Amino acid sequence: MARTVNCQYLKKEADGLAFQLYPGELGKRIFDNISQEAWSLWQAKQTMLINEKKLNMMNVDDRKFLEEQMVNFLFEGKEVEIEGYVPQKDDE
């Protein structure tokens, strides 16, 4: 049976992550409060950020920026802004 959490991003009960995917206290906070669905949404945004901003995950500043964006997205409800990206409309 899947573990459920009260997802802070989705604002509802949902299936939780199978295991802690991120290290440290932030990782525990994500594991305890973020659903698999919300994490998948973040992963898509993360990929776009890395690609569009040409982030280097070996660079400490780039990792710090990405972590800030993750916290803003998952816990503070702030949308990730990606310069030049225009979401596809449903009727296209």
From Swiss-Prot:
GO CC aspect terms: cytosol
Pfam families: Iron_traffic
SUPFAM superfamilies: YggX-like (SSF111148)
Alphabetical GO biological process terms: cellular response to oxidative stress
UniProt keyword annotations, A-Z: Iron
InterPro entries linked: Fe_traffick_prot_YggX, Fe_traffick_prot_YggX_sf
Molecular functions per Gene Ontology: iron ion binding
Family, per entry: Belongs to the Fe(2+)-trafficking protein family.
Stored NCBIfam families: PRK05408.1
Cross-referenced PANTHER family: FE(2+)-TRAFFICKING PROTEIN-RELATED
Role played: Could be a mediator in iron transactions between iron acquisition and iron-requiring processes, such as synthesis and/or repair of Fe-S clusters in biosynthetic enzymes.
Name of this chain's protein: Probable Fe(2+)-trafficking protein
Species whose genome carries this gene: Shewanella loihica (strain ATCC BAA-1088 / PV-4)
